[in-house]
Amino acid sequence: MTPIKVVVHGASGKMGQEVLKTLCQENNLHPVGAVDIRAENPAMALPDGSGSIPYSADLSSILSQTKPDVMVDFTVAKASMPAVRIAAAHKVNLVIGTTGFSPEEISEIEQLAKTNDIGIILAPNFALGAIIMVHLAQVASRFLSSAEVIELHHDKKLDSPSGTALVTVASMLEARGEAFNKPPKENLTDARGQEHDGIRVHSVRLPGLLAHQEVIFGAAGQTLTIRHDAFSRECYMPGVLLAIKEIVHTKGFVFGLDKLLKL
């Protein structure tokens, strides 16, 4: 089997480095290039010490030089959108883990997949446990009409609420088919978080955290809490690998890893 050639955009970041380390451990996946705005040297040493790969801030140059099958993107929305446009123009399939896109940007990404006849998966979360958490919250939403979401992340995360929290809320509302019970009014504006059709969403940003979320349902005499905790970025890698392997056989746009898991 011919190895899948992968370029990592955001390669100097923590997620980018974790992706490269994981790719080096896979026989059928081959890291061929690294891109990052902070690139100064023409080559990046691979984390496992097995060699180096072309490294540049110029994405178009790296794509032309390496001709990858897939580009993995873990950056920020402002940097990701131009990169997605460039990769699509080069007919490179995309695995996007960046969050913070506007609805208009997501629509553009979907159109880029169609126009360029490539596969693009955009997933707010690649941790399999987090995907299952959202699925279980959907199930509970059919039976319990009061709920709140608390998401907690490290203090360097720029967007809030998190992409996972927004997907969770949207999935819960879709499963329920109507708004949740309206929470009590707040005396201090925004003290109770952001409301989405009856679901309050609370965002916590603190050093020492990585990525955590809990969905709390309440009813007379009982509560149900569904929680996922990510303690290291290693937990995202099985999902990233699945996405890379599937997207080379997929045309069009896929939103969410749950579609690949067939939940």
Curated annotation (Swiss-Prot):
Enzyme Commission number(s) from the entry: 1.17.1.8
Protein's GO biological process: diaminopimelate biosynthetic process; lysine biosynthetic process via diaminopimelate
Record key words, sorted: Amino-acid biosynthesis, Cytoplasm, Diaminopimelate biosynthesis, Lysine biosynthesis, NAD, NADP, Oxidoreductase
Binding sites annotated in the UniProt record for NADP(+): 38
GO cellular component, one term: cytosol
InterPro entries reported in the protein's UniProt record: DapB_C, DapB_N, DapB_N_CS, DHDPR_bac, NAD(P)-bd_dom_sf
Residues at which (S)-2,3,4,5-tetrahydrodipicolinate binds: 154, 163-164
A matching Pfam family: DapB_N
Catalytic reaction(s) noted: (S)-2,3,4,5-tetrahydrodipicolinate + NAD(+) + H2O = (2S,4S)-4-hydroxy-2,3,4,5-tetrahydrodipicolinate + NADH + H(+); (S)-2,3,4,5-tetrahydrodipicolinate + NADP(+) + H2O = (2S,4S)-4-hydroxy-2,3,4,5-tetrahydrodipicolinate + NADPH + H(+)
Sequence positions that bind NAD(+): 10-15, 97-99, 123-126
Active site: 153 (proton donor/acceptor), 157 (proton donor)
GO function term, MF aspect, one: oxidoreductase activity, acting on CH or CH2 groups, NAD or NADP as acceptor
Main location: cytoplasm
Protein's UniProt keywords contain Oxidoreductase: yes
HAMAP family noted in UniProt: DapB
Family label: Belongs to the DapB family.
Job of this protein: Catalyzes the conversion of 4-hydroxy-tetrahydrodipicolinate (HTPA) to tetrahydrodipicolinate.
Name of the protein in question: 4-hydroxy-tetrahydrodipicolinate reductase
